[in-house]
Amino acid sequence: MSNDSTEGTVGSCNATGLTDEKVKAYLSLHPQVLDEFVSESVSAETVEKWLKRKTNKAKDEPSPKEVSRYQDTNMQGVVYELNSYIEQRLDTGGDNHLLLYELSSIIRIATKADGFALYFLGECNNSLCVFIPPGMKEGQPRLIPAGPITQGTTISAYVAKSRKTLLVEDILGDERFPRGTGLESGTRIQSVLCLPIVTAIGDLIGILELYRHWGKEAFCLSHQEVATANLAWASVAIHQVQVCRGLAKQTELNDFLLDVSKTYFDNIVAIDSLLEHIMIYAKNLVNADRCALFQVDHKNKELYSDLFDIGEEKEGKPIFKKTKEIRFSIEKGIAGQVARTGEVLNIPDAYADPRFNREVDLYTGYTTRNILCMPIVSRGSVIGVVQMVNKISGSAFSKTDENNFKMFAVFCALALHCANMYHRIRHSECIYRVTMEKLSYHSICTSEEWQGLMRFNLPARICRDIELFHFDIGPFENMWPGIFVYMIHRSCGTSCFELEKLCRFIMSVKKNYRRVPYHNWKHAVTVAHCMYAILQNNNGLFTDLERKGLLIACLCHDLDHRGFSNSYLQKFDHPLAALYSTSTMEQHHFSQTVSILQLEGHNIFSTLSSSEYEQVLEIIRKAIIATDLALYFGNRKQLEEMYQTGSLNLHNQSHRDRVIGLMMTACDLCSVTKLWPVTKLTANDIYAEFWAEGDEMKKLGIQPIPMMDRDKRDEVPQGQLGFYNAVAIPCYTTLTQILPPTEPLLKACRDNLNQWEKVIRGEETAMWISGPGPAPSKSTPEKLNVKVED
């Protein structure tokens, strides 16, 4: 080779950062590379020259120069030469066992030892295994069992137990170690230097055993210092890089959790996909061949699963197959024990463990070698078990795998909890749909009912009496649907609704009123009649949409009323109170109204434009909500102030809404404006409901207010007096001020107030209050069809 070419080669090496020292250091750590290079690339003649040169030196002794390089207890020079190599090895996931073996080779040179043995902890950290490096051409590193960690056996076991360095000049004469080193060449060994390899946080990871043969000088304290310094440096270096690995793994885990969270919230229905995502990461986390996730059925004391890792891959990702669900007793197997005890189990040999349940292997055709089984705990209870099967790199799962998996198991609990919660929600939705289907069937009128209403004819006498404010629908129960059709046609015109849809709607509304004493179908038609009378006596004041909306709102304003007040539902956390925090029943009534409108053939507003449809629904909503008596007091006060100051303007929508709200209250309370016998009978119905609510409160140990206490029925007249003065009279007074044609309501209310005062005084009240209009006719009534033209 010419000088020019030689210079070019050296320059190239320098450019890449290689130095003679780094190459030598690498070859010291990798003697097999040198062996292969020599055997393949160096001629026999050259080897002979090397051998002749070598015979001039002691064959078993390292050169003084080589020894001195590693005898500095601060590892000056060696650290700098090997640091980048070691970090590179560790950063790329290099085998710590092999790396420590290579470093042990350096320590052997530094201490002039004849040989060494490197031990690592066994599967359960209670035994030692001697490390056998790979062969020159092929083969994998091996760990050969060397016995349990206990005193009274070998020096390595003794040091592992005590975690203290031992320097023994003559091991064969030391009674503490009856088995000596336990190595095959132990009879030639005399002096032993045995050191524990401990991490920076105090965990024992291995034992280095250096020895010298018979006839050699025994190890001394300086050798111990050199070896200790080397191991300390190596332990710190490895720990530092492992910490970095751990941080990288934590970052990876955090990224994974964010990814899974995004997956879950973006596609909440794909629970199987979420579980697959988790199981894939869990496999990679501990380098397992298979993964299984079992959920716990505490009711039946079983474990079950329907998602299985079949060991195949597609585009580099494991395939999970959803099959028929398998179940087995919680009393069986390793997974069963983990589910029962909540303890982590790390089984190095599954078939040697009597707890292993072979049924799953028989079912799947898979052979299980080792298992890492972790409980998934939520709210102090085991809700699932994650089982990692067959460690890929290594003979079994390690303690590090356990620690990493414990951290991951916390998120598994969250994911599994979400999965179970979603499953329950889906199950509840199915029950809900079935229930709604049944409810729909039983709450929709029959064809006979709505067709009968279409053919119904209303007596002429009733048509005349309907126009009166104090008209009582009570005696005409079979005619109530027809009465409402008549009022709709009189107020809004016969073509305002399709007759078939209107009849369907009315009869289904009737069916959805419950059989409670007061808030029932009769009350609905009574309130609708009062609104009809107000609209008829204030003709031209309200739009067509308002007239339609208000009459429908009155008919539906107490739909599905259960006979209990809002305060009762809220006090005892009724589901309706959870749905509607304010105006609970009123919001439910509106919701039921919309539900009926959405039934097939029931949408009486289907001919309206979309904007008109929204308007009429809003009119109905506001009107029904206004029947919440808690809202009445503030509304009436505002209207009274507007009226007194002259600021009330019915062209202002907010003012108009307030007036309509007062009209709804007046209609809802209209029983106080009927003839006295009707008013008194209706009061009995109202109190029947109040007392039923009071009885329920008493059952729960709560004393109801006097109005709801049947034991205080003697206080009813006094209570009515207070109600009239505080609520009814002010309501009709303000309404009369704004809408003067409604004055008959105020007059009738005052007459009934006088009747209650007479009751309190003990006077006879068995009389009818005279009212406008003709007396009921005793003649045979003329028949009129409900479809009356204006």
From Swiss-Prot:
UniProt xrefs under SUPFAM superfamilies: GAF domain-like, HD-domain/PDEase-like
The record ties this protein, via PROSITE patterns, to: PDEASE_I_1, PDEASE_I_2
Task: Give the residues annotated as active site.
Answer: 519
Residues annotated as binding 3',5'-cyclic AMP are 290-291, 334-335, 368, 387, 519, 720
**Catalytic activity from the UniProt record:** a nucleoside 3',5'-cyclic phosphate + H2O = a nucleoside 5'-phosphate + H(+); 3',5'-cyclic AMP + H2O = AMP + H(+); 3',5'-cyclic GMP + H2O = GMP + H(+)
Keyword Nucleotide-binding present in the record's keywords: the answer is yes
- Binding-site list for 3',5'-cyclic GMP: 519, 720
Domain PDEase, residue spans: 446-763
What EC numbers are recorded for this enzyme?
Answer: 3.1.4.17
Binding positions (a divalent metal cation 1): 523, 557-558, 668
Q: What's a single GO MF annotation on this record?
A: cGMP binding
Cysteine pairs forming cystine bridges in this chain are: none
**How does this chain assemble?**
Homodimer.
Q: Which family does it belong to?
A: Belongs to the cyclic nucleotide phosphodiesterase family.
Record-given protein name: cAMP and cAMP-inhibited cGMP 3',5'-cyclic phosphodiesterase 10A
Question: Gene encoding this chain?
Answer: Pde10a
